[in-house]
From Swiss-Prot:
Purpose of the protein: Required for normal plant growth. May be both photoprotective and play an ancillary role in photosynthesis. May structurally stabilize thylakoids during osmotic and oxidative stress.
Subunit comment: Associates with the major light-harvesting antenna complex polypeptides of the PSII oxygen-evolving complex.
Presence of keyword Cell membrane: no
Primary localization: plastid
Keyword Nucleus in annotation: no
Protein's UniProt name: Light-induced protein, chloroplastic
Species this protein is from: Solanum demissum (Wild potato)
Transit peptide per record: 1-63
Compartments where found: Plastid, Chloroplast thylakoid membrane
Induction cue: By light. Levels increase upon illumination and stay high in daylight, dropping back to basal levels in darkness.
Length: 326
């Protein structure tokens, strides 16, 4: 009794408790914490502290100790701060494969060679070495068994075929340049179209051949040409003349000639417009010798390397590939 009397002398606040098992009443019962009837065995081992902090971001901290299965307060609650942001770590950039590096080096080596016409002997040797390395790592060793990869338009980027050099040479084609040489393949109909686009001062035109191909081996196809097509000229933008031109070290003012050149240009434009309305000219190719074969030594979704007669090599890049950009 002496210990209980001393306990009653400790100053404390009154704790209000609402019993969940009692019948509902309009009056809330209160019990002093100093009462001996209140301190049960379970409550004597419980310590509960609730703290409230003043913070720009309010938080509530609850802590429970001596937790057991009968503890109605549950386990310790972690501190929760509102407005948290989840941080996702970015993956490091993927390292390019050896094939991708070789293709990039090849594309860089082809730049400025005019499809092989202007390539020096040193550049040619470098290109041949890169082609050989790519051929040894061909991801599709049986290209004719992956015909869907052949589909689409392929732009000629380089060739060692000397038969195309006169066509590529500007000296043999005054005032005309070769704008594009391409090959379009349709594996469903087994057709191939080779096309050369020429660009002049006022118009562009094209010459193309249509052919059928047959699969002869996992790498080789036989091509037979059937017809040729000469496209009608398509009018381009007007010629923009400079104020002066340099000739033999002297600047010559060409402004007095602009009127004459403009009248000639207008006349030529009217002629080109009348021709452009005409259908293209088609002619059959009946020569039995109009055949060739191609051996595809490298193929992926953006690069194709075939070899032709006499060991000539061609490098073609799929239209839209980043390899076409310098």
């Amino acid at each position: 009794m002496a210990s209980i009397s001393s306990l009653n002398q400790i100053p404390c606040k009154t704790l209000q408790i609402t019993s969940q098992y009692s019948k509902p009443t309009s009056k809330i019962s209160t019990l002093p914490i100093s009462s001996t009837n209140f301190l049960s065995k379970t409550e004597q081992h419980r310590s509960i502290s609730v703290k409230e902090f003043t913070n720009p971001k309010p938080k509530f901290t609850a802590q429970a100790t001596n937790y057991d299965k009968e503890d109605e307060w549950g386990p310790e609650v972690e501190q929760i701060r509102p407005g948290g942001v989840a941080v996702v770590e970015e993956e490091p950039p993927k390292e390019p494969s050896e094939i991708e590096l070789l293709k990039k080096q090849l594309a860089d080596s082809l730049y400025g060679t005019n499809r092989g016409l202007s390539a020096s002997s040193e550049t040619r040797a470098e290109i041949v070495e890169l082609i050989t390395q790519l051929e040894s790592k061909n991801p599709n060793p049986a290209p004719t068994e992956a015909l869907t990869l052949l589909n689409g338009k392929w732009i000629l980027a380089y060739t060692s075929f000397s038969g195309l050099f006169p066509l590529l040479s500007r000296g043999n084609l005054p005032l005309v340049r070769v704008e594009e040489i391409s090959q379009t393949i349709d594996s469903e109909s087994f057709t191939v179209q080779n096309s050369v686009v020429f660009a002049g001062p006022l118009a562009t035109t094209s010459i193309s051949t249509n052919a059928k191909f047959e699969v002869r081996s996992p790498k080789r196809v036989q091509i037979k040409f059937e017809e040729g097509i000469i496209g009608t000229p398509q009018l381009t933008d007007s010629i923009v003349l400079p104020e002066n031109v340099e000739f033999l070290g002297q600047k010559i003012d060409v402004s007095p000639f602009k009127g004459l050149i403009t009248s000639v240009q207008d006349t030529a434009s009217s002629v080109v417009k009348s021709i452009s309305s005409q259908p293209p000219i088609k002619f059959p190719i009946t020569n039995n010798n109009a055949q060739s074969w191609l051996l595809t030594t490298y193929l992926d979704d953006e690069l194709r390397i075939p070899r032709g007669d006499a060991g000539s090599v061609f490098v073609l890049i799929k239209e839209g590939s980043p390899l076409l950009k310098p």
